[in-house]
């Protein structure tokens, strides 16, 4: 829409931009999440390591636009590992964990402090994948025991409320160690165990089963997925007998196979991944040996990851979320 000449002015008294609608001057309000929060914040919660305890309840955070070591945020209300996460611009939600639990917990991303009880998943499980838009969070797949009882369940929650998850539909396959990312309309689940290169998609605001999107460049279990509103990235993961440092990317609004983006700084799997509108970040993982490394990339470019800093403790199988990802 063209703005008529002279219809915009800056009011020196109120220090606001104003628009003239033909009868009166009106203030133009603006809001950016990054201005309100001091920059997109990435949060890493839970995990498994060897110091100071095997199962960690630690929650760390970073400011994604900077570099440097993570800072302590608080503790998980329910201790475990192999959970996954989703978030709005204000609230982060962590679902499931090992030993298999149906507990969902939440934090307020812009503050610090311990997580609180949100509700329950429809099925106790761990190594599920998570994603969200600004209002709805999804948790998919996972398993209930090391013997390999896997699920294709997709649950959903309304992030701004509390309460139990509800059934959304099913993935195209029964899978664990799956990862997720999203735009504001479409959710993507990729990889998993048993080892697969399959990528599924759903429309977040509806209910129903997932459909096939395409394939990763290689089959991987335990990759870390993150996205802005355009591009989804999948980094690392396990290939039978070894681990991977490969980063793939997709264009979320299309269908098709993933393309090579570059490499992580280390070969590792079971890391947490989160993003702002410009950067993707991976933290922790197993290489072999538990890692505290944090890597980052510029999402709309291609190339290898660069060192960001370190988590407060070494661990893998941790959840990650942000208040600036592609679903918002």
Regions inferred by a protein language model and the residue ranges of each:
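Polar, enzyme-active/binding microenvironments
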Residues: 1-328
């Amino acid at each position: 829409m063209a703005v008529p000449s002279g219809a915009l002015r800056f009011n020196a008294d109120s220090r606001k931009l104003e628009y003239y609608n033909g009868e009166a001057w009106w203030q133009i309000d603006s809001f950016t999440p990054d201005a309100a929060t001091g920059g997109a914040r990435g949060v890493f919660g839970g995990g498994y390591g060897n110091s100071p305890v095997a199962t960690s309840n630690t929650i760390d955070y970073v400011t994604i636009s900077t570099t440097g070591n993570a800072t302590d945020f608080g503790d998980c209300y329910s201790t475990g590992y192999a959970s996954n996460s989703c978030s709005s611009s204000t609230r982060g939600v962590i679902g499931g964990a090992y030993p298999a639990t149906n507990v969902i917990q939440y934090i307020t991303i812009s503050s610090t402090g311990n997580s609180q009880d949100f509700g329950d998943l429809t099925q106790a499980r761990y190594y599920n994948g998570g994603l969200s838009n600004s209002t709805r969070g999804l948790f998919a797949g996972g398993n209930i025991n090391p013997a390999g009882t896997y699920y294709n369940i997709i649950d959903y929650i309304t992030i701004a409320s509390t309460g139990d998850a509800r059934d959304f539909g099913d993935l195209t396959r029964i899978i664990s160690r799956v990862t997720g990312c999203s735009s504001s309309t479409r959710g993507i689940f990729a990889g998993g165990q048993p080892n697969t290169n399959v990528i599924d998609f759903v429309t977040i605001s509806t209910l129903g089963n997932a459909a096939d999107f395409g394939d990763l460049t290689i089959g991987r279990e335990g990759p870390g997925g993150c996205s802005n509103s355009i591009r989804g990235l999948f980094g690392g993961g396990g290939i039978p007998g070894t681990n991977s440092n490969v980063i793939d990317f997709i264009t979320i609004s299309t269908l098709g196979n993933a393309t090579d983006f570059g490499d992580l700084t280390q070969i590792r799997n079971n890391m947490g991944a989160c993003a702002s509108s410009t950067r993707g970040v991976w933290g922790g993982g197993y290489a072999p040996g538990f890692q505290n490394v944090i890597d980052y990339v510029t999402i709309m470019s291609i190339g290898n990851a660069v060192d960001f800093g370190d988590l407060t403790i070494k661990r893998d199988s941790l959840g990650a979320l942000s208040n600036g990802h592609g679903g918002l």
